[in-house]
């Protein structure tokens, strides 16, 4: 198969890029949310206030209590009266709305005004101020969101996606095209809940939306890589990016900075992760080894697995779902090192790195799986001298992720906690029927495929499928109450509870059983037809759940943002009260004046003049890494009440104070090491690929 782009494909790509440039330059019609006919508390449309009817001067209304992202909004109203009244805007998290008060002209029935939210607001409210004249009548009230660039992003991605699919399609035979069509259908089917205006609102949607906003805030503040963002906890900031790696989410954060709405970004993530899951499972299963039919069946089973879909839509475990998308690559690499071609050890390092950058708990699960696999295969690995390949993969994985692991450890040592979620670990294990029901966590399609595999004669290369079945069954057992988890908790001194729930072992069980079941389904002669039947069966079992999410699931409305408050003090300094973040004011202790105060995420600037020693307490949590300078000269920083960041001003200090978060010198060294390792790995891969292409061209010339 010729993998080089043809001249026509290159011209088509250039055409797509040119069209995208035109869209960016001319501006595609934006996407805007309109809240029409807004009803306020006690003031609906056509509500009239009259002094002669006993109504008094004062504020009326309140609501609609929206969580809105930062931006410029437009309020349009139809209010009549014989006096100069006003509209007051407010929120519950202390953000200064500019302007806060809008005047109504008695001579103008329909009018509008623009106001700005410098940061995300919680519980946005509109109040009608009846303060002049004898009557006031409100006929209509409309709120217009900022204009988002969702359509431009969607058009650009659709153009590039269509070009990529066309290039792949041209290189496939008839059977390959059938496989691509089935995989695309599975990805579209599992994305149905987000193919609408609003995103699905699940248990953790707000948390992961805040992660993206926190990441975008850190990028806007000039951090690269981002360690502390200033969005979470009402602008006080959180070190989420250190403990919950989000390097793979940077493109989504850049889209937010490019004007995309958070709901569109979450919808796009869902579609992309479904497509990525299908592609990586198919590509990995093809190499494990397995037939094309087995790989296709495995991918369809995996994409449509109820456990994965529940994690995507019921709880929106963004990190775990992303880790599950790249998990097949890790399994392929582990197979190559233990029983396949050991020289392919970079696959194990690549898969492990992607999992580390997705979800730390899945990383622990993969480490346990790798340990068990190595112990099981240790005699053969020693005999075949495979341990050097394993050590190379482990070493490269450590170097590639040094920039993530070292900041995590150092912040833990500095007093930052990793979460306060407490669960009854052994009590949250699953009952067996929850796993084995047709629409259960494992479900009928995987069970049928595994049964077919057990009933077929093992082919010469069937070791991979059977090993996957054994390890998958073991992971299923670990997820249920059949395993003595209460004893395991006591035996490990509670260390095992870091995994939070025993059912997380299904994260490993599902891809392992999917590959085993795929081989079972493909053991017959009608491989492609069987794959179509597998997809139909998977959709039949997953369909009721997907349909329920589409019809009844809660939604995160387009135009609204995520709550800037957080409920639990995760990734915070010990002893922090995250509920005490309503006050966003700068506190001054001592004889000092502060003017021209500006805060943007984790950056603060202001003009200061201190007649005596003074301490400024800033609305930022004081993570180690903040620096303060006065006209370029460093100042001492520390922790104040509720672990807020403090800056000490000496007597006579005068000038411009700037505060920002900077990476520790040790972190910068680790960043450089990981970057150099990545560059070396990519360079080595490119060189090997070019060498292989030259050998193939030489062999082709000799054959002629």
Label every model-predicted segment.
Residues 69-73, 120, 624, 652-653:
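A glycine-anchored, Pro-Gly-centered beta-turn/N-cap motif
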């Amino acid at each position: 198969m010729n993998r080089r782009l043809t001249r026509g494909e290159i011209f088509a790509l250039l055409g797509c890029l040119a069209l995208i440039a035109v869209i960016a330059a001319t501006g595609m019609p934006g996407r805007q949310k309109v809240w029409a006919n807004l009803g306020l508390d006690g003031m609906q449309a056509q509500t009239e206030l009259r002094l002669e009817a006993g109504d008094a001067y004062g504020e009326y209304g309140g609501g609609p209590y929206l969580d809105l992202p930062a931006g410029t909004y437009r309020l349009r109203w139809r209010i009549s009266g014989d006096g100069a009244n006003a509209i007051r805007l407010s929120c519950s998290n202390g953000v200064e709305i500019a302007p806060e008060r809008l005047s109504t002209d008695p001579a103008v029935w329909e009018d509008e005004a623009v106001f700005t939210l410098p940061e995300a607001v919680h519980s946005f409210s509109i109040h009608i101020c009846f303060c002049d004249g004898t009557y006031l009548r409100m006929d209509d009230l409309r709120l217009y969101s900022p204009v988002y660039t969702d359509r431009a992003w969607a058009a650009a991605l659709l153009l590039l996606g269509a070009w990529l699919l066309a290039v792949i399609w041209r290189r496939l035979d008839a059977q390959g095209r059938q496989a691509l069509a089935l995989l695309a259908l599975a990805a579209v089917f599992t994305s149905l809940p987000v193919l609408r205006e609003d995103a699905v609102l699940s248990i953790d949607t707000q948390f992961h939306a805040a992660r993206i906003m926190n990441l975008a805030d850190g990028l806007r503040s000039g951090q690269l890589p981002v360690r502390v963002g200033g969005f979470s906890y009402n602008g006080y900031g959180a070190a989420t990016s250190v403990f919950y790696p989000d390097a793979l989410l940077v493109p989504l954060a850049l889209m937010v900075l490019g004007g995309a709405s958070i709901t569109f970004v979450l919808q796009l993530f869902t579609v992309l992760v479904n497509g990525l899951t299908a592609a990586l499972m198919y590509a990995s299963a093809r190499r494990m080894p397995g037939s094309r039919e087995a790989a296709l069946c495995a991918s369809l089973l995996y994409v449509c697995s109820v456990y994965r879909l529940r994690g995507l839509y019921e709880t929106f475990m963004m990190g775990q779902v992303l880790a599950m998308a790249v998990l097949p690559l890790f399994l392929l690499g582990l197979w190559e090192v233990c029983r396949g071609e050991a020289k392919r050890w970079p696959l194990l390092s690549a898969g492990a790195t992607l999992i580390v950058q997705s979800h730390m708990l899945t990383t622990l699960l993969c480490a346990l799986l790798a340990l068990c696999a190595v112990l099981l295969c240790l005699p053969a690995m020693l005999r075949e001298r495979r341990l050097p390949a394993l050590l190379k993969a482990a070493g490269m994985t450590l170097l590639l992720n040094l920039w993530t692991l070292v900041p995590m450890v150092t912040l833990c040592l500095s007093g930052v906690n990793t979460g306060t979620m407490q669960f009854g670990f052994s009590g949250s294990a699953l009952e067996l029927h929850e796993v084995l029901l047709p629409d259960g966590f494992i479900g009928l399609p995987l069970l049928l495929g595994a049964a077919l595999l057990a009933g077929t004669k093992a082919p010469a290369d069937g070791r991979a499928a059977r090993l996957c079945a054994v390890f998958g069954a073991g992971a299923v057992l670990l997820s249920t109450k059949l395993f003595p988890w209460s004893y395991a908790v006591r035996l490990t001194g509670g260390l095992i509870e870091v995994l939070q729930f025993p059912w997380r072992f299904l994260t490993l069980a599902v891809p392992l059983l999917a590959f085993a079941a795929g081989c079972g389904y493909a053991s017959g002669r009608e491989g492609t037809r069987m794959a179509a039947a597998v997809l139909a069966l998977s959709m039949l079992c997953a369909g009721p759940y997907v349909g329920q999410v589409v019809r009844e699931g809660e939604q995160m409305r387009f135009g609204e943002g995520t709550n800037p408050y957080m409920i639990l003090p995760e990734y915070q300094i010990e002893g922090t009260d995250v509920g005490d973040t309503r006050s966003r004011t700068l506190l001054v202790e001592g004889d000092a004046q502060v003017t021209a105060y500006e805060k943007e995420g984790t950056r603060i600037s202001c003009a200061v003049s201190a007649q005596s020693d003074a301490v400024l307490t800033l609305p930022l949590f004081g993570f180690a890494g903040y620096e303060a300078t006065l006209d370029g000269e460093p100042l001492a920083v520390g922790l104040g009440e509720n672990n807020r960041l403090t800056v000490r001003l000496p007597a006579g200090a005068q000038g411009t104070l700037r505060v920002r978060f900077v990476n520790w010198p040790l972190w910068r060294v680790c960043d450089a090491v990981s970057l150099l390792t990545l560059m070396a790995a990519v360079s080595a891969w490119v060189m090997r690929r070019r060498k292989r292409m030259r050998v193939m061209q030489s062999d082709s010339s000799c054959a002629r």
